[in-house]
């Protein structure tokens, strides 16, 4: 029986893949003079935390100060892209209805996302996420959580809900996120689908 629901955010509740890819491409060219292939997005960027992606793009280990500066620069580009495209900057169709229904059923909800704090602050304000999610149940990339496909984001989200991971249901769109949910033993008797 499902006792709590955990959502990935980017690509799941908010389809921002075009905005993310545009921002990553602009950022990678400005900072590393390199392009990013569709295959790299699929396997090495979508669903991953910024530390992993930035070190991959840089081709070397980065200091915390370098990662922080690069994250701020990339996410500033991303937020600017979103703000210039209000027609495509909204929660996915049906998301609000689903969240309202889950809240009405008193199911505890959490978010487990590789997005950094700068983006979380933007999303909370832009989408009024506090209607459904307590701030302490939004697990984001603060630099201390091992990135997906490691189970850490989902385990921390289940812990925030005060539930065993096996009693949670996850909504996720990225291969690395599905692997993370599986690795966390989320919904032990659930099935995993990739679209």
Task: Walk through the language-model features, giving the residues of each.
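N-terminal helical cap/lid subdomain that shapes the substrate entry/recognition surface
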Residues: 2-96, 100-105, 118
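Active-site flanking residues adjacent to catalytic metal/cofactor-binding acidic residues
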Residues: 7, 171-172
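Conserved SAM-binding loop
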Residues: 13, 43, 109-112, 170-171
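Substrate-recognition "cap/lid" segment bordering the active-site pocket of phosphatases
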Residues: 88, 116-169, 175, 179-183
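Short glycine/proline-centered loop/turn elements that form peptide/ligand docking sites
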Residues: 96-97, 174-177, 188, 192-195
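Hydrophobic/aromatic residues located in beta-strands of well-ordered beta-sheets
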Residues: 109-111, 138, 168, 188-189
